[in-house]
Amino acid sequence: MAAPVGAQARKLLRDLVLRPPLLAARSQVVQLTSRRWLNLQEYQSKKLMSDNGVKVQRFFVADTANEALEAAKRLNAKEIVLKAQILAGGRGKGVFSSGLKGGVHLTKDPKVVGQLAKQMIGYNLATKQTPKEGVKVKKVMVAEALDISRETYLAILMDRSCNGPVLVGSPQGGVDIEEVAASNPELIFKEQIDIIEGIKDSQAQRMAENLGFLGPLKNQAADQIKKLYNLFLKIDATQVEVNPFGETPEGQVVCFDAKINFDDNAEFRQKDIFAMDDKSENEPIENEAARYDLKYIGLDGNIACFVNGAGLAMATCDIIFLNGGKPANFLDLGGGVKESQVYQAFKLLTADPKVEAILVNIFGGIVNCAIIANGITKACRELELKVPLVVRLEGTNVHEAQNILSNSGLPITSAVDLEDAAKKAVASVAKK
């Protein structure tokens, strides 16, 4: 058996297993979840798996109560599980605007499936991860409910420290894997996979054994692991997480629940998958930002951040916190910026009623600071900017950019560095 991973497992699981990035400053933490990235509904992920030989529960998808009833009859199962399809977690404890409690229900009666679906479809489901008003449910998944005699955890993910895919597993599944990594790190197992050679039979067998699959189940589990890895490569995933990866009393190895993350840079060759992206659950401002190749994440503060590069954006949020302020958003311009993008970015930021100041923090490597400056002055004039604006520019054509701003006659506050910019932005809000 392969040696279990100790302290390394904690870091690996903390950093790489389906957890959004965290920005911490002093005692405050902001959780950033970018929903602009591709997200698939549960039924879509399961169909991808099923189409590629991975064992999942039998299921149907319905968008009316009658379809759900007919699907339940067609399943002809001893027990049926009905699941509302939304991207947010916590469905089981959610509440519908119809009054129904719970987005996941078990029943043995197909008629009950129809009755429950009638209270789900077309109604908003509110969970801990949705906005207060919830998210409208458009589809439900009607699946065969299988007994689970044992639950394990399995994930395949890209690990930059290993320069390739890594197989991570634990015989303790069905729970938060980070809790396992923290309390029982010896129960986390890892197999580094050579991306050129692919997964070896010995690696799949060893992981199956470490997960506690014995006898015929060991070969069955190893086969499923290899199929999951092949799917991982085929669809350009950055992570496939199966929790639980379990066995049934009848001796079947089944992927009961799965979450898949995709490499957005592979969209050009994964058009069918990216066409499934349901943007209807996004905040309207996120979809509007995406139209102009802007990455936007709304936060609950009052200082808007207008930055190029995700790392710089996170650092900007951090330093605002350190100086006693709260960021209102995370807006990343990216690389090849045009004046029109700068204008649209300002339009988005000023449309947010929470915003009381705007901090522009640009490091011009690829980005031309002069283009940014021209976009800023145009936006300020045409949008009649009414909130304080603090600008810190550095890099390509910065002197030309500074001249554009200083000669504009607009009330723009310049900053010499990020620390100075954050202090001035926080101070501008404090004066109100």
Curated annotation (Swiss-Prot):
GO biological process: succinyl-CoA metabolic process; tricarboxylic acid cycle
Gene Ontology MF annotations: ATP binding; GTP binding; magnesium ion binding; succinate-CoA ligase (GDP-forming) activity
Residues bound to Mg(2+): 243, 257
Binding-site residues for GTP, renumbered to this chain: 57, 90-92, 146
Cofactor dependence: Mg(2+)
Family membership noted in the UniProt record: Belongs to the succinate/malate CoA ligase beta subunit family. GTP-specific subunit beta subfamily.
Protein name, UniProt field: Succinate--CoA ligase [GDP-forming] subunit beta, mitochondrial
Organism expressing this protein natively: Bos taurus
Gene name in the database record: SUCLG2
